[in-house]
């Protein structure tokens, strides 16, 4: 696609698909510069069409693995463990489009199992952040009946851009400046309880083996007694720390109260999500389900 919109927010055009965009620099017209850009775009397309795919490799089981910055250690531990077991791993960054791509590929039958480490997109959909993957996130694997291990990774935060993008109704909440362009808001007790209910409603639809694996010592790198100092929206010290065990407990309690135990297993571990042993347990459990154990 050759478009002057290629230099801006292209989510509406690209979405979750592998679309290549060329920015023509000038508006669409024929001149020396745009002719060269159009020519480059055509050559790129021709090259992709002529590519000799050769012999296809023997198909391995495709495992979808979700990741987000604050739970990246968990994903980095899990990925090689899955590969050692002979699986091919597709990694999805849960920034909205990543979760959309995951759900769509599962529905197309291209994914055999899901290790859903980062479910932060559900938080943004429920609470009102900017990285939502839509209302159907975390449902396709259950509907398709494929094995899934679901972890409440990064559900302790709601994603916004710069501080001025945070709605005024939340100006007195607890925040953390992840980068100059990413502002995180801590989920409170009420929101966490609502998330527990939503998780249960989604996972109760599962037609295949499903496990909720809960790291009781924290859902993200920030969700820990050793986590960073929280701030207010103006950048000063927050009224309370980011680590909020009562909020995490509210999520777990609501989840257990609403979960259909006849369809979904629930397992709590006295570990932090980013401990290597937690990733090992998640991989072991998914491997067992794939192999019918």
Residues covered by each model-derived region:
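Metallocofactor- and cofactor-centric catalytic cores in central/energy metabolism, strongly enriched
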Residues: 1-143, 148-150, 160, 184-293
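Short loop/turn segments immediately following the C-termini of beta-strands
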Residues: 153
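Active-site gating loops and adjacent loop-to-helix segments of metal-dependent hydrolytic enzymes
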Residues: 169-178
């Amino acid at each position: 696609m050759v478009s002057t919109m290629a230099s801006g927010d292209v989510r509406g055009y690209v979405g979750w698909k592998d679309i290549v965009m060329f920015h023509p620099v000038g508006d669409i017209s024929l001149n020396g510069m745009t002719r060269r850009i159009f020519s480059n775009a055509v050559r790129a397309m021709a090259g992709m069409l002529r590519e000799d795919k050769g012999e296809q490799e023997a198909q391995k089981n495709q495992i979808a693995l979700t990741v987000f910055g604050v739970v990246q250690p968990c994903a980095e531990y899990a990925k090689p463990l899955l590969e050692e077991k002979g699986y091919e791993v597709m990694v999805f960054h849960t920034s909205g489009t990543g979760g959309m791509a995951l759900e769509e590929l599962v529905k197309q039958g291209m994914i055999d199992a899901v290790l859903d480490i980062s479910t932060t997109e559900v938080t943004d959909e429920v609470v009102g952040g900017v990285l939502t993957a839509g209302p159907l996130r975390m449902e396709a694997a259950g509907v398709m009946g494929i094995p899934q291990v679901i972890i409440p990774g990064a559900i302790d935060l709601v994603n916004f851009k710069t501080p001025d993008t945070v709605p005024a109704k939340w100006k007195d909440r607890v925040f953390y400046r992840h980068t100059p362009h990413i502002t995180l808001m801590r989920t409170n007790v009420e929101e966490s309880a609502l998330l527990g209910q939503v998780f249960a409603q989604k996972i109760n639809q599962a037609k295949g083996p499903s496990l909720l694996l809960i790291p009781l010592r924290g859902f993200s790198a920030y969700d820990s007694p050793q986590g960073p100092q929280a701030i207010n929206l103006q950048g000063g010290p927050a009224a309370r720390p980011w680590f909020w065990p009562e909020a995490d407990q509210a999520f777990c309690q609501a989840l257990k109260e609403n979960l259909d135990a006849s369809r979904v297993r629930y397992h709590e571990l006295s570990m932090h999500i980013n401990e290597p042993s937690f990733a090992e347990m998640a991989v072991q459990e998914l491997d067992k389900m794939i192999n019918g154990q």
